[in-house]
UniProtKB/Swiss-Prot annotation:
Residues 521-602 are annotated as: Disordered. Residues 524-534, 548-576, 583-599 have a biased composition (Pro residues). Plays a role in the regulation of cell morphology and cytoskeletal organization. Required in the cortical actin filament dynamics. This is Formin-like protein 2. Keywords: Actin-binding, Coiled coil, Cytoplasm. The DAD domain regulates activation via by an autoinhibitory interaction with the GBD/FH3 domain. This autoinhibition is released upon competitive binding of an activated GTPase. The release of DAD allows the FH2 domain to then nucleate and elongate nonbranched actin filaments. The gene is FMNL2. Its main location: cytoplasm. Residues 381-478 form a coiled coil. It comes from Bos taurus (Bovine). Interacts with TCP11L2; this interaction promotes muscle-derived satellite cell (MDSC) migration and differentiation.
Amino acid sequence: MGNAGSMDSQQTDFRAHNVPLKLPMPEPGELEERFAIVLNAMNLPPDKARLLRQYDNEKKWELICDQERFQVKNPPHTYIQKLKGYLDPAVTRKKFRRRVQESTQVLRELEISLRTNHIGWVREFLNEENKGLDVLVEYLSFAQYAVTFDFESVESTVESSVDKSKPWSRSIEDLHRGSNLPSPVGNSVSRSGRHSALRYNTLPSRRTLKNSRLVSKKDDVHVCIMCLRAIMNYQYGFNMVMSHPHAVNEIALSLNNKNPRTKALVLELLAAVCLVRGGHEIILSAFDNFKEVCGEKQRFEKLMEHFRNEDNNIDFMVASMQFINIVVHSVEDMNFRVHLQYEFTKLGLDEYLDKLKHTESDKLQVQIQAYLDNVFDVGALLEDAETKNAALERVEELEENISHLSEKLQDTENEAMSKIVELEKQLMQRNKELDVVREIYKDANTQVHTLRKMVKEKEEAIQRQSTLEKKIHELEKQGTIKIQKKGDGDIAILPVVASGTLPTGSEVAVGNFVGPVMGAPSSGPLPPPPPPLPLSSDAPEAVQNGPATPPVPPPPPPPPPPPPPPPPPPPPPLPGPAAETLPAPPLPPPPPPSAPPLPGTSSPTVVFNSGLAAVKIKKPIKTKFRMPVFNWVALKPNQINGTVFNEIDDERILEDLNVDEFEEIFKTKAQGPAIDLSSSKQKITQKGSNKVTLLEANRAKNLAITLRKAGKTAEEICKAIHVFDLKTLPVDFVECLMRFLPTENEVKVLRLYERERKPLENLSDEDRFMMQFSKIERLMQKMTIMAFIGNFTESIQMLTPQLHSIIAASVSIKSSQKLKKILEIILALGNYMNSSKRGAVYGFKLQSLDLLLDTKSTDRKQTLLHYISNVVKEKYQQVSLFYNELHYVEKAAAVSLENVLLDVKELQRGMDLTKREYTMHDHNTLLKEFIFNNEGKLKKLQDDAKIAQDAFDDVVKYFGENPKTTPPSVFFPVFVRFVKAYKQAEEENELRKKQEQALMEKLLEQEALLEQQDPKSPSHKSKRQQQELIAELRRRQVKDNRHVYEGKDGAIEDIITALKKNNITKFPNVHSRVRISSSTPVVEDTQSWQASLFT
């Protein structure tokens, strides 16, 4: 640790020249125990401690050995005693000179100990016994006293210098007064009170001044500031420093030191404190003290003087400019901010920054630019305020115009939707008529085909008959047969025997020719002909067969080919040459060929679904890389018949796409209560203010309130109900009155009171009204009818747009060819990704569209939906605006079709009830007019409801979903979400392309500059660095970065590190014509550190 060495040089040399041997590693249990102790002593943040716990045993043992080797050798009181010895005014000059030679080394070792030792050592140094902070602040005040005194003596006489020697004593008073520290941050009373007394009630001596001059020539002030910085890096120490009455003042007074490095360190520490809420007030108070002590005419005068004069030390100038930037612009109060800005303006900051605008220091340029970017231009702000008022008036006017236009747009949309629905209904009707015409055409076409076939067969039969007649005449000429005409016009064919006589026997009839058949008996009637056998169309004409026995058996009939009509049986063979002359029956036609395979397949392998439609089996797709799984919900092959997926071909899409690029992007990485009659009788006997009430108290009270709202008498109300007069009784009153329809028990109580002939005057107004109200015939029906009539128009106006939106959305989704193409692309890419693991599918559930955003590319920068959007834009530009074909989908998504259909049924029941009432009172013109005017409207609404239901069922089935389990509130939002996500993906793709293009242009521009200039020239290097800084500033202006420093050990170091990296250059509430204000660096205030963050 930092306090490893002893104070004397011998021990220091011994440790420097003796390296201890490495001890053997203990058992793992003991190792872990000792390692836990070391970690606890180091007081590390949780993330760093977690990192050390991940070390292996060898590294853990090395860390333990290092920690035990550099153990704390000097307790805190050792350093405190030495510092107190330097502050002893009674010590001689010679002895002080000998002691102070090692003061800087003591302070350095103290700083290292404060920075590296465990928190317990620091707490011991700061406790009530040691009061290390008081001693350290007192020594800092002593070390820089001479600098302040010498500076004042330049501008004043010797007498005034003695009088002005009070600041050192004032600055270190009360350090030993009480042991309790004052209350923390913002306690200005303790700071102002220090001017009332001197440390020793005496003026500093000449010896003290000379000793201080001796110390000021060393680095003691710088190392003291480092010690205070190390203390402030702990939560406990930070609170003590902020609570100390003089610590921050002495740090600020250290700006009088002649070392620029010390002044830069002071400004960095003060800037870090300034970024803590509440710290800004402390810093300003310290500079008020600085002004008084150093005799400044204006606050920050010496700071600006150092800033101007130390122009050869860039680090100090950067720290000064950074401090000015933070102390001015980290204030949220705009007026106070302008005040601080004007303080520096009076000190000449603006003119000096104008001179420094061409500085070659990039860090200084960044701080100057940050200050200028956050400067308030009050004149411009006033002009902006006036412009803002005019703009607000214009905005109000535009908002009013937008409101009117929105109303007109809504009316136009409703009108357009009604027209669209009418057109869609006509289209659906025409489609149905077209389907009927197609069926009729199909049947007529079949009949025509059959008739043509019959005509063709008849022509062929006539031709065969003519051929047979020719053959018969030829045989007759040859003398083989003889033709004999009968009386009935038939012709008998008689065969001729060898002796030339014609034997008697049976005859052969061929067509209209009849002849005896050889070998058949001549007597007896002919037997009936055999049943016809099916033959081909080339078979000979029908011949009646007799019982004759032919000399040669007939050939078997050919097999019947499907599906010709059955012709007559074939003729028997003729004897003699006739058997040889007649043509033989033709061969049967070949069997019909098998059905051809589906288009696009090389194999006849098919799958038959329940509709007997053949579906080709999809082969798995082999990919080069392992692809992520797209977790869609697939449809089974028997579920796609009649859906959109039966009409698309995803394999054809894959031929158009660059699947290699796709693989490269998405490859994987690794009502009231009943009234009791007995209780009602008891209420009759009770008297309250000479009135009897039969109704329940709350019910009577509510009825009285309702009747008072109407302002009508009971007679007027009952008469209006009887004639359905909605002009006298508004529908709202009717609906309220329906809650007070008399119950069965109330009617019994009222009738009992009436039968007992008790005076009605004793009843309350509500009971008398209920007496008349309950006597109205069919009261429930009449009240229901009145409410129905009163709400009918409103119900029609409410339900019609909902049904129209369902119809329009359903038809537009089903008829969208562009949407079908999008689904085709999704199916193709999904099968490409899943085929090797899950196999190809034929369709997917619509809920799978929501999963497109969950499937991300290998670099996690884009999703599958982003890729699909790119593919559509590059290869299928014509379908990129598919969402323009989907009409009123968002409105349809908000409709509960089931409830709408129930409301339509309720309207029908109300109309039926009204019709029945009208049949009983046909003289009522109000009911007659209502039925006449609105029955057609209800019929149209019912037709719309039927069309909406059918259209929705069709589109749901078309996409492979179940209408019973997929209501509109589930079906349509899928498309709403998909369209929204698709549009967003398009925008993000476009933005990404623009960014890539801008980056490419920037790189090309830089390359061109590099080619034009000498890369080694200083001006080229400076310009490139400035361009990089400006680009960094622009990026930070775009982002909303809030610098939040939480209360934890090391917070001060984090702030100072951020300051050195120029990470805090933007501040809140900056309004300018040119730029947009950036966000505030926010740091937890000191009180929150003490109250909550340190617990």
